[in-house]
Structure formats: structure tokens, C-alpha cells
Amino acid sequence: ELQHDSEYRRRAVFALESLAEPMLRFPTAFGHLLGCADMELHGAIEVALVGRRGSSKFRALETAVATHYVPSLVLAGGPPGESQMVKLLDDRPLIDDQPTAYVCRGYACDRPVTDADTLSEQLENAAKAGAVATA
């Protein structure tokens, strides 16, 4: 999901489909792959954190994400304008020149936020609602 690359997605789905029978027979041996299968079926909740990593406000946003259990979470962070390697960070500007968080599902994002409390609310709502399929 970080790159939104259809070729990577095709390969991942092929790997999951190829191992479907063994995953059914021996689920405890495939914990990570079962998590990937869940993400493929139900979609991901994506969080983009944009800002200077060392700042206290950026760390507060990181802490808000880290303190919530969100199944199928995809997280990316970094400074604005340096998103060539991570498509999730594309077109995600700072709001009022402050570190900004974007919570997205199925290529649609909640309103961008700059404070940890509002980000926590968005993450709680996202975890309750679950993700939507992106395929």
C-alpha cells in the first residue's frame, strides 16, 4: 500500500492465493500472512504523518498512533516534499506549518489534523469502523 503499485499487489495476491490451503490447515504457522490476507480482504487504514521528525509535535502525533491498536495499519512519516519513495505521503501538505496527520481508508482521507487528541479520535473511529476494501 505504501507505493500503490499494482504489480506488487498482483504478486502479493498470487502469493496469498498460492498458500491459501496451507494457511487453512496450519493457521498458527502463518500468522503474518493471515494478517496480510485480512488486509487484502478488508483494506488498510493508512496514516500519513507529515512534518519534521524531531519536533515535539511530530512525536506527539507518533505517540498517538503508537498508543492505538488499529488492525491493518499502514504508517508512513516524513518531511513534506520528500515523498518520492512513499506514495502515501504524496500531496499531503502541512496545515498552518505544523506537523499534520492524515487518516485514510480506500484512498479517502479524514480531514487532516495537527493535534494528537483529534488524531486519537480519528484512529479510534477508524478502528471501530474497520477498513473498507481498496481493490
Regions found by a protein language model. Give the residues of each.
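Aromatic (Trp/Tyr) and acidic
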Residues: E1-A135
